[in-house]
């Protein structure tokens, strides 16, 4: 623990796309969950389309067309939009959240933990994003800094 602010060594980082392989994680996990709910589609393009809705939704929030909305709600809304667009049956509320929470299970790139672990300057590593398997002391969500 740092004894003074001058000694504090903290690294706060966003993991999305840089530290975690969001695309590979979703492409790997979506087919199994789809099978569980009797859904079949091109899951690779589904993952790309799902991610592609992020910026347009954030733009709506920034413009005030949507109130401040946490990322889970935005991901769920985008998921449901894609179901309609692709003519897929809705897996129910619980199922929709199960799909949405795949964004919490993004796996790191093979060299991520080694790279983070080699930086000994930092006593605290704080990740801004949900992920699975990233070396860190704490996780931080947007709600903390809202």
Please place each PLM-identified region on the residue numbering.
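N-terminal helical cap/lid subdomain that shapes the substrate entry/recognition surface
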Residues: 5-110
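Substrate-recognition element of Asp-dependent hydrolases with the DxDx(T/V) motif
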Residues: 94-106, 112-146
């Amino acid at each position: 623990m740092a004894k003074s602010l001058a000694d504090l060594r903290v690294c706060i980082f966003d993991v999305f796309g840089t530290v975690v392989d969001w695309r590979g994680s979703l492409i790997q996990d979506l087919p199994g969950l789809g099978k569980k709910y009797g859904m079949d589609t091109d899951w690779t393009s589904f993952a790309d389309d799902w991610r592609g809705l992020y910026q347009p939704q954030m733009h709506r929030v920034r413009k005030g067309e949507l109130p401040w909305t946490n990322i889970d709600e935005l991901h769920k809304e985008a998921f449901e939009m894609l179901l309609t667009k692709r003519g897929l049956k809705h897996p129910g509320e619980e199922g929709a959240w199960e799909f949405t929470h795949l964004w919490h299970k993004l796996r790191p790139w093979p060299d991520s933990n080694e790279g983070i672990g080699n930086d000994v300057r930092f006593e605290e590593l704080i990740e801004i994003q949900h992920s699975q398997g990233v070396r860190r002391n704490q996780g931080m969500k947007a709600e903390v800094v809202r």
